[in-house]
Amino acid sequence: SIKFGLFDIGPAEPELRCKGVLDEQEKAPRIVVTDPSGKQLFEKRRSCDETTDHGLLADIFSWVDDYLEADPLVAVGHRVVHGGRDFSSPIALDERTITALDALTPLAPLHQPRCLAPVRAVQSLRPGLAQIACFDTAFHHGLTPPASRFAIPRSLEERGIRRYGFHGLSFEYVADRLTTLAPTQTRMVIAHLGNGASLCALQNGKSADTTMGLTPLDGLVMGTRCGTIDPGILLYLMQEEKMTVDEVQHLLYDGSGLLGVSGVSADMRTLLTSREPAAREAIELFTFRVAAEVAVMANTMAGLDGLIFTGGIGEHAAEIRQQICDRLAWLGVRLDPAANAKGAARIAAPGSLVDVLVVPTNEEMSIARHCRRLLVAGP
């Protein structure tokens, strides 16, 4: 599925006009568009045999043209997962840059092609429309050794095998919100917890460390991704279990994480209501790993002033927040149970040595802001 937002990018902050979801995974692919209040503005379904080469994307453009009337669409901004070494900030897309981004596919084999497919589709449907790529790796581009380094031969590092980090558009948005919500706190850990999950050590507003590495497979336990594991497991699977590279890739990306451990679901909501012991064990492993990595991030910054929860699980799963914070009591983290249950913005108990906040993320707004800056700056 593809999520999208339509923004006015007038003289100040971009303003959301509507948002939608394009879902081509269902038996009847569909688009649903709503206004910021949630009121439905448009819905269209197609049978699979009606779907064109570009699916429902052409339908979105047609609807947007009617919706905007005389106010033309000026650009499309894309979230691109991997920018590699060379792309440290948003860029205007052309054939050269698209080719360069496609070459990074081995670093994000499942994500990068899905990011670039809409770029190619827009290029075909609206060849004159400006397209802008915003990178999930860019927020972490300032990482320096040791946080950016693997313990591998330096010759490999010189060829780009290093820790890049991801979820940067989410971390960027939350970091901007924290300048208002917690302006005096300089050592924060942002926990983006969803189907994909990672942490960022935010020191003086900049990324100082993060849990994902070369690829989005690294770090925390995720919905279907394994996170950090002993690399020797990969050798064992190939040498002793005779698994192919493709089989190992599928196992690590699509068959591990919460789904693999629980055998029930990759969805935390399902696991929280399940009576299966393995579901509870998957949750326990998830919270154990998050808490352990929060401690690592605190070590990077030599302390911890605040812990921020965001992402689908981080924003909505009070029980998960409680379990993580209980594991961090030794760091002085204390939750207010009532505030946590309500999903309040601030959920730390009086006397907690660490501030704890829930901050909804907005990656679409980060993209809209970058698009506006590039369009205003011009070529």
Spans of model-derived segments:
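Adenine-nucleotide phosphate-binding core of ATP-dependent small-molecule kinases
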Residues: 250, 257-261, 268-300
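Glycine-rich phosphate-binding loops at beta-strand->alpha-helix junctions
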Residues: 305-328
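Structural signal for terminal/edge beta-strands and the immediately following C-terminal loop/tail
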Residues: 344-379
